[in-house]
Amino acid sequence: MSASTETHHASEAAVPTAPRPRPALGSKSGRLHQVPHIAGLILGVFSVLVFLWSISPVLRYYVHVPREYIDTYYFDAPDTSLSWALVVALLAAALASRKRIAWWLLTIYLVLILITNVIVSITDRNVNAMVAAVVQVVLIGILVAARPEFYTRVRRGAGWKALGVLIVGLAIGTLVGWGLVELFPGTLPQGERFLWALNRVTALAAADNEQFSGRPHGFVNTLLGLFGAMALLAAVITLFRAQRSHNALTGNDESALRGLLLQYGADDSLGYFATRRDKAVVFAPSGKAAITYRVELGVCLASGDPIGDPEAWPHAIEAWQTLASQYGWATAVMGASETGATAYNKAGLTVLQLGDEAILRTREFNLSGRDMRQVRQAVTRVRRQGVTVRIRRHRDVPPEEMAEAIRLADAWRDTETERGFSMALGRLGDRLDGDCLLVEAIAEDGEIDGILSLVPWGPTGVSLDLMRRKPTSPNGVVELMVSELATTSDQFGITKVSLNFAVFRSVFEEGSRIGAGPILRIWRSILVFFSRWWQLEALYRSNVKYQPEWVPRFLCFDDNRELLRVGFASAVAEGFVTLPRFGRSGTHDAIEHTGHHAAVPAALVAAEGLHSDGSAPGEGLAPTATGPKRPEQVRVRLDKLTGLAEQGIDPYPVAYPPSHTVTEAVESPEGTTVRIAGRLLRIRDYGGVVFAVVRDWSGDIQVLVDEARVGTDRIRAFAAEFDLGDLVEVAGVIGYSRRGALSLLANEWRMTGKCLHPLPDKWKGLSDPETRVRQRYVDLAINTDARRLLEARSAVVKSLRDSLGGRGFLEVETPILQQVHGGANAAPFLTHINAYNLDLYLRIAPELYLKRLCVAGMEKVFEIGRVFRNEGVDFKHNPEFTILEAYEAHSDYEKMMVLCRELIQTAAVAAYGREIIMRPGPDGTLVEVDISGEWPVKTMHQAVAEKLGVDVSPETPLAELQRLCDEHEIPYQSTWDAGAVAQEMYEHLVEDYTEFPTFYTNFPTSMSPLTRPHPTIPGVAAKWDLVAWGVELGTAYSELTDPVDQRNRLTEQSMLAAGGDEEAMELDEDFLQALEHAMPPTGGLGMGVDRVVMLITGGSIRETLAFPLAKPRQ
């Protein structure tokens, strides 16, 4: 993935953190802690002064007296020496970075000057030398006392090579300088000209001018100093480059990284770029996580998230920070994801959003639609010119074709060197990168017009590494390659593609909008200006046209004061700023293993089967997922499972059907041969006899294994082989124990399923309600009450279906995925269909489709099915539930009232044999309640009036209703009409306190958008709600069949939805068009099946569902 990287703009606020604790080096407090910074500052200022007077004769003239005084007694200060200015600057930087070697150099240098001053003060009785000696004694004392503060080390480098470069450079500089002195000797005698050049170039002007008989022209001294500075700079760069190579990846390092990527590479799209070979790496002590980095300008720059187990990330980060502290580097991270940035932030780093990464979800990618018009037109235009696309894995590309692709990629590159660090691999055609994808645009004549190379992102993703196009290729080649990759991704198992990284995306996007503030527009203009060189805007534009998902990426750094240096170091690392290089190209380091010392813990090299060539650990040796931590009892059962396999016993055999259920076996006469199967719930071993309890869905039976019947070896095997919870199959005859208990006298048995987890307490079962929901299968296996509830539910649903079928109703199924949410006032769930690139809702009610069938002529129709409402979860609400809706032509809501009551009473008979329901009594036990006969019927306003003790009717003014609400502390919204306020009063005063099933009728018309108005009472609808024990069980309407009135009401609802009301219905034009074909007068009924089961069984909604929704484990 190619990307530009810079520090972020001012509108992106940093996340402040407490300073990160460094290793316990130095005092960390007191005045001595500041000595390195003060020493570095003083020498830094001095080096600038030396540089300035070396190039300025005017300044040199004005500072002549103090310069000579300092040069004589305190510190060398030659009149012109750029090389000495460079030396002092390097020493200042090293001191500020707390380098121990810089402390030694400065201390030894000051001691030598001190010795000189002492000798002069004694021999010449020079007061100035004596004063300088005292000052130097104080300075040396301070340095000695502050020695622990200079704790950072210098990386090992190619010292001899750097020394050779220095000697050669100085020799050349001296010879060239000698020639200059000969050309422009000034007053310098012939015999002193070579020594003058040698002193100025090589000896850093150590010899004073007074020791020579004359001097050359002034500009010659400046050039001679420049020659020395250039030689010294070349040596320093050689040393630094050697240090970088010395700490680059080794083969074992890369092998370990690839092993970690095999396990954890699916999370970070930049993970594979960690195998770039011109990076160094540091591992967590366990080897389970690692961080790759590069040091630029004293900044230890990590890239992306740590690689490996997220639980080991903090240890890897700590190791990385410790390493940086040892060498005095500032720490920074480029391109961290939100998860990685959180981990770095916890370690003390400050976080800034750097930009956004463009992610294409291939299953959602489609060229249709207005937003994709630009890409679609480009693709069509290029295809008309005969351009096709070829996609292959790198391992499938013949060597000669890969070599040609590499040649073209280099030829089409618009920069001298390959850019990229955190989001680029830096190599192409390596044998270890066989899983990478090569996408080529092939012109009609067979020539290659464009190339994309993408690296793996876990098993199902790829991340863009390289993008090239032929300068003369038609516009749209890149769009064709990207779209073809997305649309044919199924062939390669690809579901996501990471494209370019857009720095400052929010600035480009928001700064171009109408109404953007002046600061944002100015900032965008600045970025557009710099985009002429760094392609900041081009990267954003090239990505946004694909309508990607934008995923933020972050810059993490140690200290706000280091932000400028971090930004510059990032630009150097990414290739936007090129520093001078000598010798072999840096690109070579990214292709080959140039590291000499492996960073991976040595103990892991052999233990993990790492390969020195960088390939992933061998099959069977690669680190494997450890899985969940197993309790001891589970580990014991796993060991037993292994033991059974070693004995040739299949713990999960093929089926052999039992001859009887447990209940059938219990009811069989004594002596009957039976074979039963079930779960082993209890085992009691008495030596010569073993008793066990086996349960299937029908009931329990005692199994008796007698030593006299089966022998000693087999009875011991039974006791040793089985654990509680195992599924077993037992054959034998029905008989009795010595105490007369009915038992299955076992002759044969076998395991049909080994249970790896112990069952809960045999008496208490699962006592925690959340555990009962999460492990519903265990609860049903051991809890007979839970089983009875499911059996009752099955009986209720079957009764409802049979009752309606017996009345001539036809059962149908209507769509669950709907384009418009309607049929009820509720918040919907939203989903997306990739085939049509279309947002859909999970239905909140089947009503509108069932009414279409009524228009079609189905006079009696019903559906029992699942609906989904994005609402709260409590004892009577679940996000998905089962609903019954039935419609009968030439009927009304009063006839639906009779139908509803009879359906529930018949369902109660199916569950218990009588028209009764079970309700919790005062002590919590279930008691029977008779629900036979007629049920109470009240109007909604009548029920509210009874609760308030005042008259309330449909004509009651809104102000009076609001006053009553205030008086009884009932909340309402000021925008509600009288109907909405009255219904809110009903829900608070009536519904919550209703116990015996009661029908409440005549609800406000404004709250019933799909209901026919009451034929005689204005302001109310022909509707009722059935309520029992505070729960609404069902509702019924005289359906609204007037299409004009229905359109007006749904239009009002759609306006509420547009205003932000999530529960308001949307306008369903297809339904309205169907209604305009005429629908007969119809009565409609809706019942919550789950709530009917709750009513009949006395359980909560969770207890009546096989698998209620539960929060995920934290």
UniProtKB/Swiss-Prot annotation:
Q: Which reaction does it catalyse?
A: tRNA(Lys) + L-lysine + ATP = L-lysyl-tRNA(Lys) + AMP + diphosphate; L-lysyl-tRNA(Lys) + a 1,2-diacyl-sn-glycero-3-phospho-(1'-sn-glycerol) = a 1,2-diacyl-sn-glycero-3-phospho-1'-(3'-O-L-lysyl)-sn-glycerol + tRNA(Lys)
Residues binding Mg(2+) 2, per UniProt: 1032
Q: Which Pfam family is one of this chain's hits? A: tRNA-synt_2
Would I find Ligase among this entry's keywords? yes
Q: Cellular component per GO?
A: cytosol; plasma membrane
Asked if the Swiss-Prot or TrEMBL record annotates the protein with the keyword Disulfide bond, the reply is no
The topology of this chain with respect to the membrane is: Multi-pass membrane protein
**HAMAP family under this entry?**
Lys_tRNA_synth_class2
Q: Which NCBIfam families match?
A: lysS_bact, PRK00484.1, PRK02983.1
Task: Give the protein's biological function.
Answer: Catalyzes the production of L-lysyl-tRNA(Lys)transfer and the transfer of a lysyl group from L-lysyl-tRNA(Lys) to membrane-bound phosphatidylglycerol (PG), which produces lysylphosphatidylglycerol (LPG), one of the components of the bacterial membrane with a positive net charge. LPG synthesis contributes to the resistance to cationic antimicrobial peptides (CAMPs) and likely protects M.tuberculosis against the CAMPs produced by competiting microorganisms (bacteriocins).
Protein name per UniProt: Lysylphosphatidylglycerol biosynthesis bifunctional protein LysX
The gene that this protein is the product of is: lysX
